[in-house]
Curated annotation (Swiss-Prot):
One of its GO terms (cellular component) is cytoplasm. Residues 36-69 are annotated as: Disordered. PANTHER family: ACTIN (PTHR11937). Residues 47-56 have a biased composition (Basic and acidic residues). Belongs to the actin family. ARP4 subfamily. SMART domains: ACTIN. This is Actin-related protein 4. Involved in several developmental processes including organization of plant organs, flowering time, anther development, flower senescence and fertility, probably by regulating the chromatin structure. The gene is ARP4.
Length: 443
């Protein structure tokens, strides 16, 4: 088997916001990059591209090479992954492989994995066992698809799929806990008992960091703040130390790329100024709250007031989002629950004997869990909603890096344990039993 010393496993976690990859045994992932990709459809060819192609074909026929198969090129799209996204390109759409926490486009995931292995970690995947973190809500079909890609395309020697909630639990040294994972695309609450997710306890909500960022953006827009994406202007020096912002005219920029760049700025505003209010947000009470200033990339300074408290409070009270102009409400807003309700519902779906233990170790993880005061407020509200004399303890790592990467860190710990080495689903087993065997090897 894969003894710990001679070959290190790779741990990879593709979330809806970012992809984390690195070596098992490390304390943080080596590569972290966005999980969205830029895509340019290469069908409608521009005249320039056509001329280039014709010239190429002519030179190829001189050199005796065959011209490229045109049919193949008709539907091709070129994907830009990782740092390539930072550069604006004409007609580049930004697309995500995930919808509601599950993968919908495997081609993009494949490109993300490939980028992580070949460009960031600089490894040959054929030489390393892979531990892949998967959502607690993953279906059997999704798992088989991931396993098939890994064995058939990357020819990995061994594979293990571990659930996000279990890994978060391991990251804080527990085998039983209630994991509240608030990531970019969604928030998932799941009970973990003795290292297994109790599927009946899993509760999900579409409110994650990206939704809060959108609320922040729409709220600022409604107050007349214009967020200029970084690519859309340049600063021109008009005097010593004085700059004038000049807008650049880039008509072929897609809406999705513009939105992606504006979200990046709104997200930074959210991370810089927001904190969860101690009690439920109330427009009147927070009307005169002191503002915090934030400087946008183009130099204008904005003042953020009540929104600092209102935006994070959407996690606790989703209906608040409907008071922000321009935010699309959820199709069924009644079914979207706040965090404390999700926690109580999840615990109540578990066996009576373990409820006490779950409530006394509620773990926070995911990027959105780093909002200030979230831990204290959640503890207070769950305590109010739970019955009488239960002890409620919300645990969260003191530093936000550990909260953000807790799934990856749990994977790093798990894959480097000596006792874990017999758990791998090996290539030999895959060839003997087929892909469906993953359901038995990785419960």
């Amino acid at each position: 088997m894969y003894g710990g010393d001679e070959v290190s496993a790779i741990v990879i976690d593709v979330g809806s916001y970012s992809c984390k990859a690195g070596y098992a045994g490390d304390d943080t992932p080596k590569a972290v990059f966005p999980s969205v990709v830029g895509s340019i459809e290469q069908t409608g060819e521009t005249d320039e591209a056509k001329a280039d192609k014709e010239a190429e074909a002519a030179s190829d026929s001189k050199n005796g090479a065959k011209p490229m198969d045109v049919d193949k090129a008709k539907t091709k799209r070129k994907l830009y992954v990782g740092q390539e996204l930072e550069f604006r390109r004409d007609h580049m759409e930004v697309i995500s492989p995930m919808k509601d926490g599950t993968v919908t486009d495997w081609d993009i995931v494949d490109n993300i994995w490939n980028h992580a292995f070949r460009q960031r970690l600089l490894i040959n995947p054929e030489e390393h066992p892979m531990l892949i973190a998967e959502p607690s809500t993953n279906t059997g079909q999704q798992r088989e698809k991931a396993a098939e890609l890994m064995f058939e395309k990357y020819k990995v020697p061994a594979l293990f799929l571990a659930k996000n909630a279990v890994l978060t639990s391991f990251a804080s040294g527990r085998a039983t806990s209630l994991v509240v994972d608030s990531g970019g695309g969604s928030t998932v609450v799941a009970a973990v008992h003795d290292g297994y997710v109790l599927q009946k306890s899993v509760a999900t909500s579409p409110i994650g960091g990206e939704f809060l960022t959108d609320c922040m953006m729409k709220s600022l827009e409604s107050k007349g703040v214009v967020i200029r994406p970084r690519y859309s202007f340049k600063k021109k020096e008009v005097g010593p130390g004085e700059y004038k912002v000049v807008d650049l005219d880039l008509p072929n920029t897609t809406e999705s790329y513009k939105l992606y760049c504006m979200r990046a700025i709104a997200s930074d505003i959210k991370e810089s100024v927001c904190r969860v209010p101690d009690t439920a947000f109330d427009e009147v009470a927070y009307a005169n709250v002191p503002t915090t200033s934030y400087e946008l990339p183009d130099g204008q300074t904005i003042e953020v007031g009540a929104d600092r408290f209102k935006i994070p409070d959407i996690l606790f009270n989703p209906s608040l989002s409907q008071t922000i102009p321009g935010v699309d409400g959820f199709a069924d807003s009644m079914s979207v629950r706040g965090l404390p309700r999700m926690v109580i519902d999840s615990v109540n779906r578990c066996d009576v004997d373990i409820r006490k233990e779950l409530l006394s170790s509620i773990l926070l993880s995911g990027g959105s869990s780093s909002i200030l005061q979230l831990k204290e407020r959640l503890e207070k509200e769950v305590l109010e909603e739970s019955s009488g004399n239960t002890r409620v303890k919300v645990l969260a790592s003191g530093n936000s890096v550990e909260r953000r990467f807790s799934v990856w860190i749990g994977g790093s710990i798990l894959a480097s344990l000596g006792s874990f080495q017999q758990m791998w689903f090996s290539k030999a087993e895959y060839e003997e039993h087929g892909v469906s065997y993953i359901q038995r090897k990785c419960p």
